[in-house]
């Protein structure tokens, strides 16, 4: 049990804890709450990490204790802090811990007066001058109803530095019902008679928050998070299938019931639920360096894009399909070009949410234009640079 005196010793513990926006207010320690969603770490740097948990079964507002140590028994504590949370933040508890040692393993836990979280662990990133091998795995498109999370169990057995989520961590829509086309049920959200292929879909902030709780009810996912840091981005299903964030009505027809409020709810739930180093109100594109070998460039391919060409259909390229249109948006595209051009890493890894290459089907049809193949002008501008092609993966 962490006590007030121990928390006040934080300044002498060795590491520093930066409280993220939802955790800046003073609050008394919470007496209740459960940690059913487990613990998460993310965006490791040589000297820092973001730590997160989300409380259940709690009311009012208050604070949660965070403790970071170099051993699993917490005899060698390097950081302690009390973090405020409330219903307005979805009971998300998030902090950035800094002044850590490069490529070191640490352990962490959260606690209220009546409950404590599982213990998580993480390893900070390699220092800039390190030539050591970097090991990571990635996942995406994790529809809860469509299959079990056995792959997470296999990942957790590996010796990894971190894992990458390339988007679709949740699915706002449930397309499958247990016993029919699905292996388990997701009954969150509302039905939409205009979309008979969808069983239910999230439309409110409460719905989107409930999605993260449902997906993390799977022990294999919680165990993966407790073992490795995650570097995450979003794709479309964190809001709505195939929406285009910079297009009127999301580029969707009226039957999809897309609204700006729905997008805002999806974004807020994601920002509450994911352990990453946020650099702006809703900016999630960023880059992380791992020694001399890996520069991981995480993109946002939803928020700034224009509508897909050709009605986003599975058809041959239509007239004007290769006309200039935004996919990353000018600011992000210029940032990515500068980062790739200036990176001296052996491998420059692009965190893509959709395929970079064309997906041409028999008969000359393209498998939709939601990916880079619908935004060829930006793709060519990003890749048509000899100074950063060497060692480029995406």
Protein language model regions, located:
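Long, structured stretches of catalytic cores involved in phosphate-ester chemistry, encompassing
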Residues: 2, 26-93, 100-394
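C-terminal segment of classical bacterial N-terminal signal peptides
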Residues: 20-24
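Terminal low-complexity, poorly structured segments
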Residues: 14-16, 26, 96
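N-terminal secretory signal peptides and thylakoid transit peptides that target proteins
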Residues: 1-15
């Amino acid at each position: 049990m962490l006590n007030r005196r121990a928390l006040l010793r934080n300044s002498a513990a060795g590491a520093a804890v930066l409280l993220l926006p939802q955790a800046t207010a003073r609050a008394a320690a919470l007496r209740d709450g459960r940690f059913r969603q487990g613990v998460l770490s993310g965006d490791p740097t040589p000297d820092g990490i973001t730590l997160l948990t989300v409380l259940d079964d709690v009311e009012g507002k208050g604070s949660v204790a965070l403790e970071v140590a170099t051993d699993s028994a917490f005899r060698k504590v390097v950081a302690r802090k009390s973090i405020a949370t409330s219903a307005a933040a979805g009971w998300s508890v998030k902090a950035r811990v800094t002044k850590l040692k490069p490529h070191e393993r640490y352990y962490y836990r959260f606690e209220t007066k009546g409950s404590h979280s599982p213990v998580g662990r993480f390893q900070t990133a390699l220092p800039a001058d390190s030539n050591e091998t970097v090991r990571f795995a990635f996942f995406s498109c994790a529809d809860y109803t469509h299959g079990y999370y056995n792959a997470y169990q296999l990942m957790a057995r590996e010796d990894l530095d971190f894992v990458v989520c390339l988007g679709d961590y949740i699915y706002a829509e449930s397309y499958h019902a247990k016993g029919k086309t699905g292996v388990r049920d997701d009954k969150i959200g509302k039905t939409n008679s205009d979309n008979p292929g969808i069983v239910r879909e999230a439309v409110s902030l409460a719905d989107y928050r409930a999605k993260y709780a449902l997906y993390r009810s799977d022990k294999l996912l919680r165990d993966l998070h407790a073992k490795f840091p995650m570097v995450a981005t979003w794709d479309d299903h964190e809001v709505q299938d195939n929406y285009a964030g910079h297009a009127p009505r999301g580029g969707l027809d009226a039957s999809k019931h897309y609204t700006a409020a729905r997008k805002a709810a999806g974004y807020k739930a994601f920002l509450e639920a994911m352990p990453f180093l946020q650099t702006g109100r809703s900016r999630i594109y960023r880059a992380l360096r791992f020694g001399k070998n890996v520069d991981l460039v995480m993109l946002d391919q939803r928020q700034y894009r224009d509508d897909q060409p050709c009605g986003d259909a599975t058809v041959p390229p239509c007239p004007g399909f290769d006309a200039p249109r935004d996919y990353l948006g000018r600011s992000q595209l210029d940032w990515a070009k500068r980062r790739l051009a200036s990176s001296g890493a052996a491998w420059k890894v692009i965190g893509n949410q959709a395929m970079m290459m064309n997906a041409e089907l028999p008969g000359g049809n393209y498998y939709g234009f939601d990916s880079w193949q619908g935004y060829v002008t930006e793709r060519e501008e990003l890749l048509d640079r000899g100074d950063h092609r060497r060692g480029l993966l995406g």
